[in-house]
Amino acid sequence: MEKKRQYHPKGTRVQNHKYRKHHIWPWIVGLVVLAAVGAAIAYFTSVYFKTKNAVDKTYDPHTAVKTTGEFNGKKRFVVLLMGTDTGALDRTEKRGRTDTMILAVVNPAKKRYTLISIPRDTMAQMIGADSFQTEKINAAYELGGAKMSMDSVSKLINVPIKYYAVVNMGGIMKMIRYVGGINIRPTLSFEYGGYIFKKGKLTHMGGAGALAYSRMRYDDPRGDYGRQERQRQVITTLIKKAISVSSLSNLDSILTSVSSNVRTNLPFSALQQIATNYRGCAKTSTSDYLHGYNAMIDDAAYQVQPTSELQRISNKVRAELGLEKETISNNETYQNKRNIAHGFSFKSGKTQDYHIYDYTGDDDNWWRLFMRRWSVISLVIFWLRWLSEKSFWK
């Protein structure tokens, strides 16, 4: 008898359940991964645009320069950092004088950056003024904004300066607050603004404390030079703390909070490249300052730098930028020469009167002008003699 063929299902109910479960799980995992990736992209996109919007608020298009290829991680650059004590840096606000002026020179070849302080009372020509004008260097920002500040410092020490950032003191406080404060060993003991600082004792400072620490001047035996050193100390410590903070979620909050207190001509793309390509330079730093002497100009107290000191700082910055040394010849070297000729001495140890003489160009301008005119006269005489020897003059 022929046996009937029996139908056997592919598996039991349990087996079928296992089969479906085995094939469904990859889809579930895939969807979860896609959702996670999508959420991450959405999050970082959101943070990116929040950060970009915050940075865009700090951008000053009036002094914009092309930055294509400038920040590739190999090229060196310098930024003029300025600090003011005015309110928020709204575009409609009246500019104040800069209490702090620091050149930040970034050198990827040596994986370091250098901070060089320019004393606020430094005598300098205001480059870009309608007529010849000599003021304290901190007046440049009030008179002609960031461009006059960059041009005046550039001419003072003969280095090219294309970029700047001006920060209100309130902005520094907020930045320090958002990174959780900074730890500093004070360079001297003093009390200021309700805060007590002990020399050499590691002290945790919030925004207000760090600001008080960097502001005090009159109780420092070194005066403004001591204050400049403390300012560089705060900035250096803040930079190191900022790069150690890895939480991207706080970045847009930090930038949003300080956007009304910062102005710069570095666009968002440039800041991105600096943060990415020069991160290794932030771990090592050196510092210096332009040293001057007390002098009275029209009954006002100034700092006047000898030509040798201007040359020293110029050589140092140019070396960090990979540039050849050049002999400084400007208004300040001209004024030094004229004042020394009339009895001024940088070695006197006393506060002396310093006079400003008319200046229209290079150092030794009168001699060069005389030589140029004499050369023209000599050429004319030679030409007339040559013509007189020709037959048609006879």
Regions found by a protein language model. Name each.
Residues 57-60, 125-128, 265-370:
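C-terminal solvent-exposed extensions
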Residues 70-75, 174-253, 262:
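Flexible, polar/acidic helix-loop-strand segments at domain edges
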Residues 74-77, 95-101, 110-118, 132, ...:
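Extracytoplasmic
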Residues 88-92, 135-143, 158-163, 218-225, ...:
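Second-shell loop/turn segments in exported
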Residues 98-100, 134, 146-154, 169-173, ...:
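Extracytoplasmic/secreted envelope proteins and their assembly/folding machinery
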Residues 366-367, 374, 383-386, 393:
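Tryptophan (W) side chains
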